[in-house]
A protein has these predicted regions:
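Phenylalanine-focused residue identity feature
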Residues: 26, 30, 36, 43, ...
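Flexible domain-boundary/linker segments
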Residues: 37-39, 50, 87, 99, ...
Length: 238
């Protein structure tokens, strides 16, 4: 227990994974699909204690879900890829979860008098997206004077998820609706690569992490994602 003075260690986690799936390969691509269940006994958690975070074995956590990925070549030059995941995650047992010290959550989750933890059994863990998916397309082509090029576009969606236990979505959440694209070239001799790229072209705003601020009751800290970003990369191969 990391809350015990002088003890900064925790016991190992014990994970049990069950998965059943199907793989299909055909002329122009493939599809993989899997159902899974993961159970973690004694999962390690950084529990907030008011003045800092303590690593401890918190109980049992279960993830159940569906995973799908595949690729399909529409032609020799154009390839479509996709992946998706659905996860139902729950704390089966979490007796010493971080209680709400911000006053932003429901009163039932407020810190009890003289305590800094609360029973979160039955609640959903923070930071695990219930649904996420990625769709991408890559078009490859030959240059008139030799060399090769490609154009790639990708869309990523991650359903909004809370970033800290008991802090509402409206205060601290993470999600993605990002469009990325790149245009690249390789010289005929393979010595030079050049790529023009853009990330988060939708300029989607979200936090990537958030947590209660140590020694400042009623407040929290967070880090935003990168805004719309453009760049050019030139590489010499030896």
């Amino acid at each position: 227990d990391g809350r015990t003075p002088g003890n900064r260690t925790a016991d190992p986690e014990e994970a049990t994974n069950i998965e059943i799936g199907l793989k299909a390969v055909f002329d122009n691509g493939y599809v993989n699909i899997a159902l899974f269940e993961q159970s973690i006994e004694g999962f390690q958690s950084n529990v907030f204690g008011g003045t800092g975070f303590n690593l401890e074995n918190a109980g049992k956590e279960t993830h159940e879900g569906l995973e799908l990925d595949g690729m399909y070549a529409l032609s020799d030059d154009l390839v479509i890829g996709f992946s998706a995941m659905y996860i139902d995650a729950v704390y089966d047992e979490f007796l010493n979860g971080t209680c709400d010290a911000t006053g932003l959550s429901d009163p039932e989750f407020a810190c009890p008098t003289g305590a800094s933890t609360i029973d979160l059994s039955g609640n959903s863990p923070a930071g695990i997206h219930e649904l996420s998916y990625n769709v991408n397309a890559t078009y490859s082509f030959s240059m008139p004077r030799g060399g090769n090029g490609f154009f790639r576009v990708e869309y990523l969606h991650e359903k909004d998820v809370k970033l800290a236990d008991l802090i509402p979505f409206s205060i601290a959440k993470r999600g993605s609706d990002n469009l990325n694209a790149s245009l690249g070239f390789t010289s005929a001799d393979g010595e030079w690569d050049a790529m023009l790229w853009g990330r988060n072209l939708t300029d989607h705003e979200s936090l990537i992490s958030a947590f209660p601020t140590p020694a400042q009751p009623g407040s929290f800290s967070g880090y935003p994602n990168a805004p719309r970003t453009y760049g050019f990369t030139l590489r010499k191969n030896f």
